[in-house]
């Protein structure tokens, strides 16, 4: 199955969760914090403006992005993988380099 987001939404694969602390202590799955960054897998066509024009998104497929801890509350399971669907305005930054 493939997701095609609508409007200004993006589909993101969350990066692997950190399973160790900085001191090297291994955390059980329930104690590990979910990563707040990931890779964009699909983008919608853009945001519809009042004038009827569509403003293209600032992010593209393949971008590594950072989002807030409560962003992407819409989780969809596709081919056994949990993916996040969120609006572009929930993305805080693009990771470069």
Swiss-Prot record:
<dbReference type="GO" id="GO:0051087">
    <property type="term" value="F:protein-folding chaperone binding"/>
</dbReference>
<protein>
    <recommendedName>
        <fullName>Co-chaperonin GroES</fullName>
    </recommendedName>
</protein>
<dbReference type="GO" id="GO:0005524">
    <property type="term" value="F:ATP binding"/>
</dbReference>
<comment type="function">
    <text>Together with the chaperonin GroEL, plays an essential role in assisting protein folding. The GroEL-GroES system forms a nano-cage that allows encapsulation of the non-native substrate proteins and provides a physical environment optimized to promote and accelerate protein folding. GroES binds to the apical surface of the GroEL ring, thereby capping the opening of the GroEL channel.</text>
</comment>
<dbReference type="InterPro" id="IPR037124">
    <property type="entry name" value="Chaperonin_GroES_sf"/>
</dbReference>
<dbReference type="InterPro" id="IPR018369">
    <property type="entry name" value="Chaprnonin_Cpn10_CS"/>
</dbReference>
<dbReference type="Pfam" id="PF00166">
    <property type="entry name" value="Cpn10"/>
</dbReference>
<dbReference type="InterPro" id="IPR020818">
    <property type="entry name" value="Chaperonin_GroES"/>
</dbReference>
<dbReference type="GO" id="GO:0044183">
    <property type="term" value="F:protein folding chaperone"/>
</dbReference>
<keyword id="KW-0143">Chaperone</keyword>
<comment type="subunit">
    <text>Heptamer of 7 subunits arranged in a ring. Interacts with the chaperonin GroEL.</text>
</comment>
<keyword id="KW-0963">Cytoplasm</keyword>
<comment type="similarity">
    <text>Belongs to the GroES chaperonin family.</text>
</comment>
<dbReference type="GO" id="GO:0051085">
    <property type="term" value="P:chaperone cofactor-dependent protein refolding"/>
</dbReference>
<dbReference type="GO" id="GO:0051082">
    <property type="term" value="F:unfolded protein binding"/>
</dbReference>
<dbReference type="GO" id="GO:0005737">
    <property type="term" value="C:cytoplasm"/>
</dbReference>
<dbReference type="InterPro" id="IPR011032">
    <property type="entry name" value="GroES-like_sf"/>
</dbReference>
<dbReference type="GO" id="GO:0046872">
    <property type="term" value="F:metal ion binding"/>
</dbReference>
